[in-house]
Amino acid sequence: MASTAPPREDLITEDEEQRPPLTRPLLHRSATNNISQVAMVGSKACPIESLDYEIIENDLFDQNWRTRAKADQVRYVVLKWTFCFAIGIITGVVGFLINLAVENVAGFKHAAVSSLMDSSSYWTAFWVFAGANLALLLFASAITASVSPAAGGSGIPEVKAYLNGVDAPNIFSLRTFAVKVIGNIAAVSSSLHVGKAGPMVHTGACIAAIFGQGGSRRYGLTWRWLRYFKNDRDRRDLVTIGAGAGVSAAFRAPVGGVLFALESLSSWWRSALIWRSFFTTAVVAVVLRLFVELCGTGRCGMFGKGGLIMYDVSTLFEDLMTYHLKDIPIVVLIGVIGAVLGAFYNFLMMQVLRVYSVVNERGRAHKLLLAAAVSVLTSCCVFGMPWFAPCRPCPVAGPNGACGSLNKFRRFHCPPDHYNDLASLMLNINDDAIRNLYATGTNDVYHPGSMLAFFLASYALGVLSYGVVAPSGLFVPIILTGATYGRLVAMLLGRHSGLDHGLVAILGSASFLGGTLRMTVSVCVIIVELTNNLLLLPLVMLVLLISKTVADSFNASIYDLIMRLKGLPYLDGHAEPYMRQLSVGDVVVGPLRSFNGVEKVGHIMHVLRTTGHHAFPVIDEPPFATAPVLYGLVLRAHLLVLLRKREFLPAQERYPKEYSIAARFEAQDFDKRGSGKQDTVDGVELSPEEMEMYVDLHPFTNASPYTVVETMSLAKALVLFREVGLRHLLVVPKACDRSPVVGILTRHDFMPEHILGLHPVLLGGKWKRLRWHKAAVAKYFRDLIVRLANCG
């Protein structure tokens, strides 16, 4: 239950004051939990609310359901599939336009730099390169900070939290969508070490959410058939479908997009949703294929077939894409290394984001200064490091002194018929660098020193770049970093490994993805779809399982850590061990506000003005019942509708039998507003005479809310709360001689900050168990390494 947030200093506990600033949470929560919570949404702190997935079964719902014709049901089903088709078309077009813009903007910049380098104008080339990068990133940061802070970052933590039941202002607004697209184009084109995949997930979710708004009065879109989707359940399904479509648009991986939404994003899944999501991602794949063929003839500038990080290894050097049983230990080693590097990557990312938050909270100017500093550092690193790399002769000389057998390789300062392997990775967009690393039959193309330098730079820049206030993704930089260390491992092993270096680069990407994102099935399918080679499937599966298992012993996935850092109240699918020691009665806090079945208007107005609760128990008392009995649960939004309609009674009595609810109210009167929008009581003005009247709440009360007994374990209640998708869970007493309602459980009652704030004695047991778990896992892997060494 929620109201306005208190000042930040009121939420800081004594223990937190004694902790170093870089280990405190970004946003502090109240232990009493009777207030609205706030979280970082994009790059701005915003109040957050929970979503209502429960069907409100009251008299109005029953009448509307009985009068619904067969044509309405058919129209509803057809509309759902039509929306899926439209989401697929628009997401595919937007994905193509983003890649087209990035390829041309970045390509023009790199072409200008290469031209200056060829004419030995080295300093001019650097200033052009650094100046263009700075201008592009400042533009992306400025529009993000000024127009829509919710568009900052990848957006995946916010989408994942939304699909878990957390709502926040403007995460799917039209402004956020526009800033996400334009800002991501500028950020990726600025040579910042970020990607397009995460923002594409958020973009697809924005497109779907716009369809799920159920129309707009501002723009005159008020057709009746649009109102079918003015509820959180259908919006949740559409956002899930849109997020999967975004993955499909980023990687041309339709099956991987469906599995990504299922494994990583969605908290609730139904078989019917799989069909619709698969249909949408298939539409995206077809749209992208059409545009790629259209641009294959050079009509799209520098785009060609690029921009969608697809590298087909199935038809080139098939004899090199083989492996044997003796290569399995190498695959295991790659998985373990990827897990350790991924867990450390997550740890460093959290520390950097904490430091950046201290800078960003000082205002817009500091956000832009931080972006400028990161841009200058990136430009100096990207342009300066290739000077220390040796020039290598081209395997096959091409026209104008270029390497004819190598794609997208840079000559930089080298003489004709030579190339700079480090510049070929640094001075390319990430997609082309990935293609270069995945290329088979190129074992002698890179120098080990160049690989080590690029790995360290990619690792560090990936950590430093994400916290900049601009739309930025993690997926592609992680793929690139993993591919680099995969090739480096293959070089270090030398003749001890018969695996092609391009194949090991793919396995390195998989292991680093498993170590950071902690996804297995979806990442496996995405990699197979990217490389178009099923021969890789067993090795990719093995390396993902190993990397995820090992990395889980250190910390959580990067998206989960970011959600916790932002303060988004995400409910995990499993309960913490200490929750089994508590009952729901141990965490319910008061005071509880309730209404009579026939309540005075003035009392309702007073409660709505003095509290921020979003639901209230309705209790029938004499003369409407022989003893106090729970009738149901009424929502705050529904009470506001009743007050605006002014359907009041002069005395404390129920509506007469001839009273027709359908004649005075329509189901659309109680439709849920769009994401992040809340009705307020401030706009309700009543006369003193109306304040003395009464309103019958029975026809508008959910008469069958979910209830639990106060003795139920908190862990069991959490499973029920999450699986059903509840916003409110009523707690009833064990004995009959008490009040019919003990309290109401909401999402924030299950948060560790709230539970451990009420019962701090459990805190030591929680961390003690965690330390034992890590020690046991570490001992297990030490013994495993010893056994492998003895076998060898």
Regions found by a protein language model. Give the residues of each.
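Residue-level detector of beta-propeller blades
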Residues: V629-L630, V741
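Glycine-rich beta-to-alpha transition loops that act as phosphate-gripper elements at the mouths
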Residues: I619, V708-T711, V732-P733
